[in-house]
């Protein structure tokens, strides 16, 4: 039995893949703050046996009540990274295993790291539960590739570069590959990479170069900080340098600069027509 929290773009993909494996996932529930989104996902999948529910993922008590009612063996968290800790806490209180695709970050600071979630490690171990963090593509598959290479192809890994290239074209002037708020927060904060036992900080998108990708060709690639670096240098101590690169088109970056210049990338509250809004969330 699996409970999926989140019915956005990533949650929709996860629900479809889970539903394609009924031999593994015999019972499925999708839960979100907006139940109608969950119902729309179920309709798109075409499996009326999938259950849906409304839940506030910021509320531990609501989560615990839902978990105790449905009794899943695992919760797949594809909600927002701000909600990782409340969902992990609810899993501990309900005795449920946990999996997510992105590490925790606080709402009021554009900064993410694993320390907040790693602090739960002993509690999950003591409860006999498993928590798998960062199990998307990057982080996730990128870590699996690294582990496979270390096990089967190299005596040790000293230099690691993870490259993320999107060669698709949606013919839109500006669109993000996942939640726009999280995506823009990620790429507008300082870059970081690991070298000789230290973390080196760079300005946002300061370091870039052309990288040539198989079957795609050269693409402008920008150094970012990505959470799997923190985990990989810890688990593969032979690494001397670890970096993460992502491709962006110039049109995308131009729109991003405009968003920043007009203040719409701000994550603090401002007053608009007598209401308190966060510009990036409003966008």
Locate predicted features.
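Rossmann-fold cofactor-recognition segment
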Residues: 45-59
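Short beta-strand element of Class I
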Residues: 27-29
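C-terminal catalytic/substrate-binding lobe primarily of soluble NAD(P)-dependent oxidoreductases
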Residues: 151-283
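Helix N-cap at the beta1-alpha1 junction of Rossmann-like dinucleotide-binding domains, i.e.
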Residues: 34-36
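Conserved Rossmann-fold cofactor-binding substructure of NAD(P)-dependent oxidoreductases
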Residues: 57-72, 79, 83
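Hydrophobic/small residue at the entry helix of a nucleotide-binding pocket
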Residues: 10-11
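Rossmann-fold NAD(P)-binding glycine/threonine-rich loop
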Residues: 102-129
């Amino acid at each position: 039995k699996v409970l999926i929290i989140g019915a956005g773009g990533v949650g929709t993909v996860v629900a479809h893949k889970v539903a394609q494996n009924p031999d593994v996932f015999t019972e499925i529930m999708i839960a979100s703050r907006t139940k109608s989104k969950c119902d729309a996902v179920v309709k798109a999948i075409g499996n009326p046996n999938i259950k849906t529910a409304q839940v506030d993922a910021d509320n531990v008590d609501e989560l615990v009540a839902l978990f105790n009612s449905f009794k899943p063996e695992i919760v797949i968290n594809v909600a927002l990274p701000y909600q990782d800790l409340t969902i992990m806490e609810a899993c501990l209180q309900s005795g449920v295993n946990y999996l997510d695709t992105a590490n925790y970050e606080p709402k009021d600071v554009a900064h993410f790291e694993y320390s907040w979630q790693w602090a739960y490690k002993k509690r999950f171990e003591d409860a006999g539960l498993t928590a798998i963090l960062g199990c998307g593509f990057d982080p996730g598959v990128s870590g699996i590739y690294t582990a496979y290479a270390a096990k089967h192809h190299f005596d040790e890994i000293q230099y690691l570069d993870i490259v993320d290239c999107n060669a698709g074209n949606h013919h839109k002037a500006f669109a993000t590959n996942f939640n726009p708020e999280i995506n823009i927060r990620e790429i507008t904060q300082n870059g970081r990479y690991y070298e000789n036992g230290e973390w080196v900080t760079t300005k946002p998108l300061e370091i870039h170069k052309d990288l040539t990708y198989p079957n795609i060709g050269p693409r402008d690639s920008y150094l970012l900080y990505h959470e799997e670096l923190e985990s990989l240098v810890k688990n593969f101590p032979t690494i001397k340098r670890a970096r993460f690169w992502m491709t962006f088109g110039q049109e995308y970056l131009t729109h991003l600069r405009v968003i920043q210049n007009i203040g719409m990338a701000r994550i603090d509250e401002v007053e608009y027509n007598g209401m308190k809004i966060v510009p990036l969330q409003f966008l």
